[in-house]
Curated annotation (Swiss-Prot):
SUPFAM superfamilies: S-adenosyl-L-methionine-dependent methyltransferases. S-adenosyl-L-methionine binds at residues 134, 163-164. Keywords: Methyltransferase, S-adenosyl-L-methionine, Transferase. Exhibits S-adenosyl-L-methionine-dependent methyltransferase activity. Belongs to the UPF0677 family. GO terms for molecular function: methyltransferase activity. This is Putative S-adenosyl-L-methionine-dependent methyltransferase MSMEG_0095/MSMEI_0092. Coiled coil: none annotated. It comes from Mycolicibacterium smegmatis (strain ATCC 700084 / mc(2)155) (Mycobacterium smegmatis).
Length: 311
């Protein structure tokens, strides 16, 4: 059970769950600077720089990795692994959306979109509409910041400012969503912030709204062993002050580590979808982005990338 969450909590881009979107965007910004980048997000740095978290802007420093290496080489390996994970995850779901577009799907829904910039940076076919669902202040920050820099979406982008714990299907319909058309859904970086029951309800609603031929891609919620989680927390504390990261939220305090959470692929297979999964570590290995860690990671602590098609 999360210790910092309540049933009706809200946030903006610099607080609570909202700040995790800045963390992820910082990882995309770092990846974009690499010569061998798996993805290119030219807008991530802009979104991080203006967020005002006072924390993740630090990661934009080109010397950040070297500073960690000097303080704690093993921690540097962990940070490199985390950055590679974000790059591989983004790469996987970018490919998912390109395949959906190639299949003729023109209705896109991004659940808890955060600072996702796909509406702006992917080469969407004409006639594509991207619906982004998230907290009102998060959506407002993203669109306003990019607009200030003269950046406009490639696809038709429609904001759906609503909490996924409330009546988001009505808000989605009000924004123009057509349930009779095939949809490509995305739940990336979301499930760990939902209780197990809310996860089931989310997929029930998505299924109700999905015409035959619809697709969904999901990042599952990994479950880290308690001792490993505590060890990581203590290691982070050792150098956080020296890197201006001491005010960073403890992400583990925001997630719901529910042991009875349904297996996503099994749930989808049982409810009218045909699903398959790729474990994150296997995908990282395939793309030559698997970093050797000081402790052999438990596969259960890492996500599986699930894709499915509505029958």
């Amino acid at each position: 059970m999360s210790s910092l969450r309540t049933d009706d909590d809200t946030w903006d881009i610099a607080t609570s769950v909202g700040s995790t979107a800045v963390m992820v965007a910082a990882a995309r910004a770092g990846e974009t600077e690499r010569d061998d980048a798996l993805i290119r997000d030219p807008y991530a740095k802009i979104l991080v720089a203006g967020a005002g978290t006072g924390v993740w802007e630090t990661v934009l420093d080109s010397e950040f990795a070297a500073k960690i290496e000097n303080l704690d080489p093993e921690a540097a390996a962990i940070f490199a692994h985390m950055g590679n994970y974000q790059a591989v995850r983004t790469h996987f779901f970018d490919a998912y959306y390109r395949e959906a577009a190639d299949a003729g799907i023109r209705q896109i829904v991004i659940l808890a979109s955060g600072l996702d910039s796909r509406a702006y940076r992917l080469d969407w076919p004409a006639g594509t509409t991207v619906y982004e669902i998230d907290q009102p202040k998060v959506l407002e920050y993203k669109s306003a910041t990019l607009r200030e820099h003269g950046i406009e979406p490639v696809a038709q982008r429609r904001e759906v400012p609503v909490d996924l714990r409330f009546d988001w299907p009505t808000a989605l319909h009000d924004a123009g969503f057509d349930a009779s058309l095939p949809t490509a859904w995305l739940a990336e970086g979301l499930l760990m912030y939902l209780p197990a029951e809310a996860q089931d309800r989310l997929f029930e609603l998505v299924t109700e709204l999905s015409a035959p031929g619809s697709r969904i891609a999901v990042e599952t919620a990994g479950v880290a062993a308690t001792d490993r989680r505590e060890a990581m927390r203590e290691r982070f504390k050792k150098f956080a002050d020296q890197l201006n990261l001491s005010s960073a939220l403890d992400i583990q305090e925001l997630v719901y580590d529910d042991p009875d959470r349904a297996d996503v692929a099994e749930w989808l297979d049982a409810h009218g979808w045909r699903a398959r999964g790729v474990h994150a570590l296997d995908e990282m290995r395939r793309l030559d982005r698997l970093v050797e860690l000081p402790d052999d990671p438990d596969r259960a602590a890492f996500s599986t990338f699930v894709t499915a098609q509505r029958l």
